[in-house]
Amino acid sequence: MKKSSSLALGNFFKTKKQILKADIQKLIKTNQINYVDPKHGTALNRAIKLKDEKIITELLAKKVDINEAIYFAIGHEYTLEEIKTLISLSSSELPDEYLYKAVHQGRLDLVQYFIEEKNFDVNTTINNPLHGGAILSIATMGEHIDVINYLLKNGAIASQGVISAILKGNIEILEKLFEYGATAHDGYSEDLVALLVNAAIPANDPTYCKSSNSETKEDLSNYVETLKFLLEHGGNPNAEFLERGTVILIALSALMDEPKNDTYKDICKLLIQYGADTSKFKSYTETINNLKKEIIEDMKVVDKSDFKDEGYVSDSAEADQLSKKGSKLVDTSSKSVFFSLEEIIEKNPTTLGGETDIVKSEFFNS
Protein backbone atom coordinates (compact mmCIF):
# COMPACT_ATOMS: atom_id res chain seq x y z
CA MET A 1 0.00 0.00 0.00
CA LYS A 2 2.82 2.36 0.93
CA LYS A 3 4.64 1.55 -2.31
CA SER A 4 1.50 2.26 -4.29
CA SER A 5 1.00 5.60 -2.52
CA SER A 6 4.61 6.63 -3.17
CA LEU A 7 4.26 5.73 -6.85
CA ALA A 8 1.06 7.74 -7.15
CA LEU A 9 2.72 10.71 -5.44
CA GLY A 10 5.72 10.44 -7.75
CA ASN A 11 3.45 10.40 -10.77
CA PHE A 12 1.69 13.49 -9.47
CA PHE A 13 4.92 15.51 -9.27
CA LYS A 14 6.11 14.16 -12.60
CA THR A 15 2.82 15.23 -14.12
CA LYS A 16 3.17 18.68 -12.59
CA LYS A 17 6.61 19.08 -14.17
CA GLN A 18 5.29 17.85 -17.48
CA ILE A 19 2.46 20.38 -17.30
CA LEU A 20 4.94 23.21 -16.67
CA LYS A 21 7.08 22.08 -19.60
CA ALA A 22 4.03 21.90 -21.82
CA ASP A 23 3.05 25.42 -20.74
CA ILE A 24 6.50 26.71 -21.62
CA GLN A 25 6.44 25.10 -25.06
CA LYS A 26 3.01 26.58 -25.68
CA LEU A 27 4.30 30.05 -24.73
CA ILE A 28 7.27 29.59 -27.06
CA LYS A 29 5.09 28.51 -29.98
CA THR A 30 2.66 31.40 -29.49
CA ASN A 31 5.49 33.91 -29.01
CA GLN A 32 4.33 34.77 -25.46
CA ILE A 33 7.48 33.89 -23.54
CA ASN A 34 7.36 37.21 -21.66
CA TYR A 35 3.74 36.89 -20.62
CA VAL A 36 3.59 37.21 -16.81
CA ASP A 37 1.27 34.67 -15.23
CA PRO A 38 0.21 35.86 -11.73
CA LYS A 39 1.18 32.52 -10.21
CA HIS A 40 4.07 31.22 -12.33
CA GLY A 41 5.56 34.36 -13.88
CA THR A 42 7.16 34.21 -17.33
CA ALA A 43 8.32 31.16 -19.23
CA LEU A 44 11.80 31.76 -17.81
CA ASN A 45 10.46 31.71 -14.26
CA ARG A 46 8.93 28.31 -14.94
CA ALA A 47 12.19 27.05 -16.43
CA ILE A 48 14.17 28.20 -13.39
CA LYS A 49 11.79 26.36 -11.08
CA LEU A 50 12.18 23.25 -13.24
CA LYS A 51 15.99 23.72 -13.32
CA ASP A 52 15.83 22.78 -16.99
CA GLU A 53 19.00 24.13 -18.62
CA LYS A 54 17.89 23.09 -22.12
CA ILE A 55 14.69 25.14 -21.92
CA ILE A 56 16.55 28.06 -20.31
CA THR A 57 19.05 28.08 -23.19
CA GLU A 58 16.21 27.97 -25.72
CA LEU A 59 14.46 30.90 -24.04
CA LEU A 60 17.65 32.96 -23.94
CA ALA A 61 18.12 32.35 -27.66
CA LYS A 62 14.64 33.76 -28.22
CA LYS A 63 15.54 36.94 -26.29
CA VAL A 64 13.41 36.29 -23.22
CA ASP A 65 13.05 39.30 -20.90
CA ILE A 66 15.39 38.35 -18.04
CA ASN A 67 14.67 41.52 -16.02
CA GLU A 68 10.96 40.76 -15.94
CA ALA A 69 11.67 37.27 -14.65
CA ILE A 70 14.04 38.57 -11.95
CA TYR A 71 11.57 41.17 -10.76
CA PHE A 72 8.83 38.55 -10.53
CA ALA A 73 11.14 36.18 -8.63
CA ILE A 74 12.07 38.80 -6.01
CA GLY A 75 8.42 39.46 -5.31
CA HIS A 76 7.40 35.80 -5.14
CA GLU A 77 9.67 34.23 -2.54
CA TYR A 78 12.14 32.62 -4.88
CA THR A 79 15.23 31.41 -3.05
CA LEU A 80 18.40 33.47 -3.08
CA GLU A 81 20.08 30.84 -5.26
CA GLU A 82 17.25 30.88 -7.81
CA ILE A 83 17.45 34.67 -8.03
CA LYS A 84 21.24 34.53 -8.34
CA THR A 85 20.82 32.09 -11.22
CA LEU A 86 18.46 34.47 -13.00
CA ILE A 87 20.80 37.42 -12.44
CA SER A 88 23.73 35.43 -13.80
CA LEU A 89 21.86 35.16 -17.10
CA SER A 90 21.72 38.94 -17.51
CA SER A 91 24.56 40.97 -18.98
CA SER A 92 22.92 44.35 -18.38
CA GLU A 93 23.38 46.62 -15.36
CA LEU A 94 21.02 45.76 -12.54
CA PRO A 95 18.35 48.43 -12.01
CA ASP A 96 17.62 49.99 -8.60
CA GLU A 97 14.13 48.49 -8.74
CA TYR A 98 15.58 45.11 -7.73
CA LEU A 99 16.89 46.55 -4.48
CA TYR A 100 13.63 48.43 -3.97
CA LYS A 101 11.63 45.24 -4.38
CA ALA A 102 13.90 43.33 -2.00
CA VAL A 103 13.59 46.04 0.65
CA HIS A 104 9.85 46.36 0.13
CA GLN A 105 9.48 42.59 0.60
CA GLY A 106 11.69 42.62 3.68
CA ARG A 107 14.16 40.20 2.06
CA LEU A 108 17.27 40.76 4.18
CA ASP A 109 19.18 38.04 2.32
CA LEU A 110 18.59 39.81 -0.99
CA VAL A 111 19.33 43.26 0.43
CA GLN A 112 22.68 41.97 1.69
CA TYR A 113 23.38 40.33 -1.67
CA PHE A 114 22.64 43.47 -3.69
CA ILE A 115 24.66 45.74 -1.39
CA GLU A 116 27.60 43.47 -0.61
CA GLU A 117 27.98 41.54 -3.87
CA LYS A 118 26.41 43.83 -6.46
CA ASN A 119 27.66 47.10 -4.94
CA PHE A 120 24.36 48.89 -4.55
CA ASP A 121 24.60 52.03 -2.39
CA VAL A 122 23.11 51.68 1.11
CA ASN A 123 21.60 55.16 0.60
CA THR A 124 20.06 54.36 -2.78
CA THR A 125 17.01 56.49 -3.54
CA ILE A 126 14.24 54.93 -5.59
CA ASN A 127 12.30 56.99 -8.12
CA ASN A 128 8.93 55.34 -7.66
CA PRO A 129 5.70 57.39 -7.64
CA LEU A 130 3.99 55.09 -5.13
CA HIS A 131 6.76 54.05 -2.76
CA GLY A 132 9.71 56.19 -3.71
CA GLY A 133 12.47 57.55 -1.53
CA ALA A 134 15.51 56.21 0.23
CA ILE A 135 15.55 52.47 0.80
CA LEU A 136 15.74 53.08 4.57
CA SER A 137 12.44 54.95 4.33
CA ILE A 138 10.92 52.07 2.35
CA ALA A 139 12.12 49.55 4.94
CA THR A 140 10.66 51.73 7.70
CA MET A 141 7.26 51.95 6.02
CA GLY A 142 7.26 48.16 5.88
CA GLU A 143 8.53 47.98 9.48
CA HIS A 144 11.18 45.47 8.42
CA ILE A 145 13.31 45.73 11.56
CA ASP A 146 16.09 43.38 10.44
CA VAL A 147 16.53 45.28 7.17
CA ILE A 148 16.49 48.63 9.02
CA ASN A 149 19.18 47.44 11.44
CA TYR A 150 21.33 46.16 8.59
CA LEU A 151 21.07 49.41 6.63
CA LEU A 152 21.87 51.57 9.66
CA LYS A 153 24.85 49.44 10.66
CA ASN A 154 26.18 49.75 7.12
CA GLY A 155 26.01 53.52 6.90
CA ALA A 156 22.47 54.46 5.90
CA ILE A 157 21.62 58.08 6.77
CA ALA A 158 19.28 57.68 9.75
CA SER A 159 17.22 60.80 9.07
CA GLN A 160 15.98 59.24 5.82
CA GLY A 161 13.66 56.95 7.78
CA VAL A 162 12.29 59.42 10.33
CA ILE A 163 9.21 60.65 8.48
CA SER A 164 8.18 57.08 7.65
CA ALA A 165 8.59 56.08 11.31
CA ILE A 166 6.36 58.97 12.36
CA LEU A 167 3.69 58.18 9.78
CA LYS A 168 3.70 54.57 11.00
CA GLY A 169 3.59 55.72 14.64
CA ASN A 170 6.46 53.33 15.38
CA ILE A 171 8.32 54.65 18.42
CA GLU A 172 10.78 51.73 18.51
CA ILE A 173 12.03 52.43 14.99
CA LEU A 174 12.14 56.18 15.66
CA GLU A 175 14.29 55.63 18.75
CA LYS A 176 16.62 53.42 16.71
CA LEU A 177 16.97 56.12 14.05
CA PHE A 178 17.83 58.73 16.68
CA GLU A 179 20.42 56.35 18.14
CA TYR A 180 22.10 56.39 14.74
CA GLY A 181 22.22 60.16 14.49
CA ALA A 182 18.81 61.41 13.38
CA THR A 183 17.50 64.56 15.08
CA ALA A 184 14.25 66.51 15.14
CA HIS A 185 15.84 69.19 12.92
CA ASP A 186 17.46 67.55 9.91
CA GLY A 187 15.89 69.70 7.19
CA TYR A 188 12.80 67.56 6.68
CA SER A 189 10.21 68.50 4.06
CA GLU A 190 7.62 68.93 6.83
CA ASP A 191 7.93 69.65 10.55
CA LEU A 192 7.97 66.33 12.40
CA VAL A 193 5.60 67.35 15.19
CA ALA A 194 3.14 68.74 12.63
CA LEU A 195 3.28 65.52 10.63
CA LEU A 196 2.67 63.40 13.69
CA VAL A 197 -0.27 65.41 15.03
CA ASN A 198 -1.86 65.45 11.59
CA ALA A 199 -1.41 61.68 11.32
CA ALA A 200 -2.63 60.93 14.84
CA ILE A 201 -5.82 62.93 14.81
CA PRO A 202 -7.30 61.72 11.49
CA ALA A 203 -6.32 58.16 12.48
CA ASN A 204 -8.62 58.46 15.48
CA ASP A 205 -11.47 60.08 13.55
CA PRO A 206 -14.43 57.65 13.17
CA THR A 207 -15.25 59.02 9.70
CA TYR A 208 -11.66 58.52 8.60
CA CYS A 209 -11.56 54.96 9.94
CA LYS A 210 -14.53 53.92 7.84
CA SER A 211 -12.50 54.31 4.68
CA SER A 212 -9.24 52.93 6.00
CA ASN A 213 -7.85 50.26 8.25
CA SER A 214 -9.23 50.89 11.73
CA GLU A 215 -6.68 51.67 14.43
CA THR A 216 -6.65 50.05 17.86
CA LYS A 217 -6.20 51.99 21.09
CA GLU A 218 -2.70 50.57 21.31
CA ASP A 219 -1.90 51.89 17.83
CA LEU A 220 -3.15 55.35 18.80
CA SER A 221 -1.14 55.36 22.02
CA ASN A 222 1.93 54.92 19.83
CA TYR A 223 1.27 58.34 18.34
CA VAL A 224 1.20 59.86 21.82
CA GLU A 225 4.44 58.15 22.81
CA THR A 226 6.04 59.23 19.55
CA LEU A 227 4.97 62.85 20.11
CA LYS A 228 6.43 62.74 23.61
CA PHE A 229 9.70 61.41 22.21
CA LEU A 230 9.91 64.17 19.59
CA LEU A 231 9.18 66.91 22.11
CA GLU A 232 11.78 65.49 24.48
CA HIS A 233 14.30 65.66 21.65
CA GLY A 234 13.68 69.24 20.60
CA GLY A 235 10.51 68.95 18.53
CA ASN A 236 8.59 72.19 17.99
CA PRO A 237 5.36 72.39 20.08
CA ASN A 238 4.29 75.41 17.99
CA ALA A 239 4.69 73.71 14.63
CA GLU A 240 2.22 74.44 11.83
CA PHE A 241 0.77 72.00 9.34
CA LEU A 242 -0.11 73.45 5.92
CA GLU A 243 -3.58 75.01 5.96
CA ARG A 244 -4.67 73.52 9.28
CA GLY A 245 -2.74 75.88 11.50
CA THR A 246 -0.65 75.20 14.57
CA VAL A 247 -0.60 71.73 16.08
CA ILE A 248 -2.11 72.94 19.35
CA LEU A 249 -5.05 74.43 17.42
CA ILE A 250 -5.54 71.15 15.54
CA ALA A 251 -5.46 69.18 18.78
CA LEU A 252 -7.70 71.56 20.76
CA SER A 253 -10.29 71.67 17.98
CA ALA A 254 -10.35 67.88 17.85
CA LEU A 255 -10.71 67.66 21.63
CA MET A 256 -13.61 70.12 21.61
CA ASP A 257 -15.37 67.90 19.07
CA GLU A 258 -14.62 64.75 21.08
CA PRO A 259 -14.14 65.74 24.75
CA LYS A 260 -13.80 62.11 25.88
CA ASN A 261 -11.10 61.26 23.38
CA ASP A 262 -8.04 60.38 25.47
CA THR A 263 -5.67 60.52 22.51
CA TYR A 264 -6.62 64.10 21.68
CA LYS A 265 -6.39 65.07 25.34
CA ASP A 266 -2.95 63.53 25.75
CA ILE A 267 -1.69 65.30 22.63
CA CYS A 268 -2.98 68.65 23.93
CA LYS A 269 -1.41 68.11 27.34
CA LEU A 270 1.97 67.20 25.88
CA LEU A 271 2.03 70.22 23.58
CA ILE A 272 1.09 72.57 26.42
CA GLN A 273 3.56 70.93 28.77
CA TYR A 274 6.39 71.50 26.30
CA GLY A 275 5.59 75.12 25.58
CA ALA A 276 2.81 75.42 23.01
CA ASP A 277 1.53 78.99 22.81
CA THR A 278 -2.16 78.94 23.74
CA SER A 279 -2.52 82.69 24.35
CA LYS A 280 -4.37 83.28 21.06
CA PHE A 281 -7.14 80.77 21.67
CA LYS A 282 -9.47 82.66 24.01
CA SER A 283 -12.47 80.53 23.05
CA TYR A 284 -10.64 77.49 24.41
CA THR A 285 -9.67 79.10 27.75
CA GLU A 286 -11.73 76.77 29.92
CA THR A 287 -10.48 73.66 28.15
CA ILE A 288 -6.87 74.86 28.29
CA ASN A 289 -7.10 75.65 31.99
CA ASN A 290 -8.59 72.25 32.73
CA LEU A 291 -5.76 70.61 30.82
CA LYS A 292 -3.23 72.58 32.86
CA LYS A 293 -4.88 71.40 36.05
CA GLU A 294 -4.52 67.83 34.85
CA ILE A 295 -0.86 68.41 33.99
CA ILE A 296 -0.26 69.69 37.51
CA GLU A 297 -2.02 66.67 38.98
CA ASP A 298 -0.09 64.30 36.72
CA MET A 299 3.17 65.84 37.80
CA LYS A 300 2.11 65.71 41.47
CA VAL A 301 3.16 69.29 42.18
CA VAL A 302 2.94 69.89 45.93
CA ASP A 303 4.84 73.14 46.46
CA LYS A 304 7.47 75.37 44.91
CA SER A 305 10.31 73.19 46.10
CA ASP A 306 9.24 70.56 43.60
CA PHE A 307 10.70 72.62 40.76
CA LYS A 308 14.42 72.79 40.14
CA ASP A 309 16.22 75.27 37.94
CA GLU A 310 16.68 72.87 35.04
CA GLY A 311 13.62 70.68 35.31
CA TYR A 312 10.82 69.31 37.41
CA VAL A 313 11.55 66.73 40.09
CA SER A 314 8.84 65.58 42.46
CA ASP A 315 9.72 64.91 46.06
CA SER A 316 7.59 61.77 46.03
CA ALA A 317 9.35 58.44 46.28
CA GLU A 318 7.85 57.37 42.97
CA ALA A 319 9.19 60.35 41.04
CA ASP A 320 12.55 60.05 42.78
CA GLN A 321 12.74 56.47 41.62
CA LEU A 322 11.89 57.53 38.06
CA SER A 323 14.60 60.17 38.19
CA LYS A 324 17.20 57.65 39.26
CA LYS A 325 16.15 55.35 36.44
CA GLY A 326 16.67 58.14 33.92
CA SER A 327 13.03 58.96 33.26
CA LYS A 328 12.77 61.18 30.20
CA LEU A 329 10.26 63.38 32.05
CA VAL A 330 12.89 64.48 34.57
CA ASP A 331 15.96 64.16 32.38
CA THR A 332 17.63 67.56 32.66
CA SER A 333 19.82 66.78 29.67
CA SER A 334 16.76 66.80 27.41
CA LYS A 335 16.96 69.14 24.45
CA SER A 336 13.37 70.34 24.99
CA VAL A 337 12.44 73.32 27.15
CA PHE A 338 10.95 72.31 30.48
CA PHE A 339 9.86 75.29 32.57
CA SER A 340 11.33 76.17 35.97
CA LEU A 341 9.15 77.51 38.78
CA GLU A 342 10.48 81.04 38.32
CA GLU A 343 9.58 80.99 34.63
CA ILE A 344 6.07 79.76 35.38
CA ILE A 345 5.33 82.37 38.07
CA GLU A 346 6.48 85.18 35.76
CA LYS A 347 3.57 84.41 33.44
CA ASN A 348 0.29 86.37 33.66
CA PRO A 349 -2.40 85.15 36.09
CA THR A 350 -5.08 82.80 34.82
CA THR A 351 -8.68 82.19 35.79
CA LEU A 352 -7.79 78.80 37.20
CA GLY A 353 -8.21 79.53 40.88
CA GLY A 354 -7.15 76.77 43.24
CA GLU A 355 -5.33 76.25 46.48
CA THR A 356 -1.65 76.71 45.55
CA ASP A 357 0.43 79.58 44.24
CA ILE A 358 1.35 77.46 41.25
CA VAL A 359 -2.25 76.88 40.28
CA LYS A 360 -2.94 80.59 40.59
CA SER A 361 -0.15 81.49 38.17
CA GLU A 362 -0.17 81.21 34.41
CA PHE A 363 1.01 77.72 33.51
CA PHE A 364 3.22 76.80 30.57
CA ASN A 365 3.57 79.63 28.13
CA SER A 366 -0.02 80.86 27.69
Swiss-Prot record:
A Pfam family annotated for this UniProt entry: Ank_2
Top-rank taxon, per record: Bacteria
Alphabetized UniProt keyword annotations: ANK repeat, Repeat
Name assigned to this protein: Putative ankyrin repeat protein RBE_0601
Ranges occupied by ANK repeats: 39-68, 94-124, 131-160, 162-186, 210-239, 250-280
Gene3D superfamilies: Ankyrin repeat-containing domain (1.25.40.20)
Organism of provenance: Rickettsia bellii (strain RML369-C)
InterPro entries reported in the protein's UniProt record: Ankyrin_rpt (IPR002110), Ankyrin_rpt-contain_sf (IPR036770), Cul2-RING_E3_ligase_SR (IPR051616)
